[in-house]
Design a protein with these regions (language model features):
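Conserved nucleotide-sugar donor-binding
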Residues: 31-32, 105-119
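Conserved donor NDP-sugar-binding/catalytic core segment of glycosyltransferases
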Residues: 47-78
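Glycine-rich, basic loop-to-helix element that forms the pyrophosphate-binding segment
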Residues: 3, 14-30
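Acidic donor-binding loop at a coil-to-helix junction in glycosyltransferase catalytic cores
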Residues: 126-133
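Active-site donor/metal-binding and catalytic loop motifs
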Residues: 147-164
Length: 201
């Protein structure tokens, strides 16, 4: 907050802690036609906003999502990360045709403000609020995906570190993807909430 105050940048404080409440606070205070998520732990390329807006301005498009990379470190080599990202990107691409809501990630998500307000952002779940929003936005138009480097963000390891090593993280996600491979070829309009994902079950 001190940095925003010193630079004169408008900001809003959300006292309720969760990604859903933070996203909803931003949406409720948005004043533009398009709402572009920007995460504080993520680096974005110079023309990220322009690239996302250009995609949003195409006829019939109500939301767009792009891809992201990780910075190599002593525990994650450049080659292993590239292989991991390639496999993940291919899966997200194939999945995006029939079930784009499963390929959306909040750190690289942008959408029409008016439609998003009609759908709303869920605050009763621990994860998946962005995908849930995308699911609701589908009835208003297309969820597009930007594959350009100009829209590729760089972020921390977050959830992939939760499963231990990069290899183990890949195994966990590969098994999950294989179990749901049939979903790549069919649309889905309703998803059942898992009990462990509900904040107040």
């Amino acid at each position: 907050a001190e940095i925003y105050q010193a630079t004169g940048v408008p900001y809003h404080t959300e006292s309720q802690h969760s990604c859903g409440f933070a996203r909803l606070c931003g949406l409720n205070n948005a004043r533009g036609k398009y709402h572009i998520n920007i995460d504080s732990d993520t680096l974005y390329p110079p023309y990220y906003v322009e690239t996302m807006v250009k995609a949003l301005e195409k006829p019939g498009v109500v939301a767009v999502s792009s891809l992201w990379s990780y910075i190599p470190d002593k525990d994650h080599s450049w080659l292993n990360l590239k292989l991991y990202e390639f496999a993940r990107d291919v899966h997200l691409y194939l999945q995006s045709f029939k079930r784009p809501e499963l390929s959306v990630r909040g750190l690289v998500f942008a959408y029409r403000t008016d439609y998003a307000r009609k759908v709303g952002i869920r605050t009763d779940i621990r994860r998946g609020e962005d995908g849930s929003l995308a699911l609701g936005l589908k009835k208003y138009g297309k969820i597009a995906f930007v594959r350009k480097r100009k829209a590729r963000a760089v972020t921390g390891y977050g959830t992939i570190s939760a499963d231990g090593s990069l290899l183990n993280s890949f195994k966990v996600r590969a098994i999950h993807a294989l179990k749901g491979v049939g979903g790549i070829f069919s649309k889905k309009e309703v998803y059942k909430d898992e009990d462990d994902n509900l904040i107040n079950p």
